[in-house]
């Protein structure tokens, strides 16, 4: 049986997983984590709701962030603010025991000035809805040139 350690997950991230009561990898995590930790490749992963997709793509992102570089290195685009908030919260919890990796979530329905202020601080991982990201780019607040990792999160569907 696979373990997070056998997938190449660091002890610090495993501690974060355990803090979320996640002890064994799911199928989507077993298929994606080792591949994505090795190198940023194009990867399409599909799995049911509640199977750990967020951890499947965010763990490799977290482990490949250079925390000494104060720039946005990963972009996660998501369709709704609720999903963006959820993703940012989980990444924050996963990084609890790592070197300081900073995640910011930006989305409509909140004051853009507060989000601009947050982005002036060090941000490594940006979680954004498309509309708010475009608005911030038009204002020249977000520089995506240093981004090495991009994840497009699809909307959950129930069948």
Report each predicted region and the residues it spans:
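Conserved small/polar residues in nucleotide/adenosyl-binding loops
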Residues: 150-159
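Conserved catalytic network of the ASCE P-loop NTPase/AAA+ motor domain
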Residues: 38, 66-70, 96-98, 117-121, ...
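Amphipathic alpha-helical segments that mediate coupling or scaffolding at interfaces
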Residues: 16, 20, 35, 48, ...
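Residue-level signature of catalytic and energy-coupling elements of molecular machines
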Residues: 17, 29, 45, 61, ...
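Conserved pre-motif I regulatory segment
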Residues: 2-44
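Walker A/P-loop NTP-binding motif
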Residues: 34-38, 55-68, 92-93
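Conserved nucleic-acid-binding Ia/Ib motif block in the N-terminal RecA-like helicase ATPase lobe
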Residues: 71-135
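Walker A/P-loop
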Residues: 42-57
């Amino acid at each position: 049986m696979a373990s997070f350690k056998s997938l190449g997950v660091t002890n610090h991230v495993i501690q974060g997983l355990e803090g979320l009561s996640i002890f064994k990898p799911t199928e989507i995590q077993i298929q994606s984590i080792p591949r994505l930790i090795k190198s940023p490749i194009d990867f399409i992963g599909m799995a049911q709701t509640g199977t750990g997709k967020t951890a499947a793509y965010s763990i490799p992102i977290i482990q490949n962030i250079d925390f000494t570089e104060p720039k946005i290195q990963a972009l996660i685009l998501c369709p709704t603010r609720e999903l963006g908030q959820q993703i940012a919260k989980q990444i924050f919890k996963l990084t609890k025991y790592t070197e300081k990796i900073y995640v910011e979530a930006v989305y409509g329905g909140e004051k853009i000035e507060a989000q601009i202020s947050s982005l002036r601080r060090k941000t490594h991982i940006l979680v954004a809805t498309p509309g708010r990201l475009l608005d911030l780019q038009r204002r020249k607040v977000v520089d995506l040139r240093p981004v090495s990792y991009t994840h497009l999160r699809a909307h959950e569907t129930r069948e």
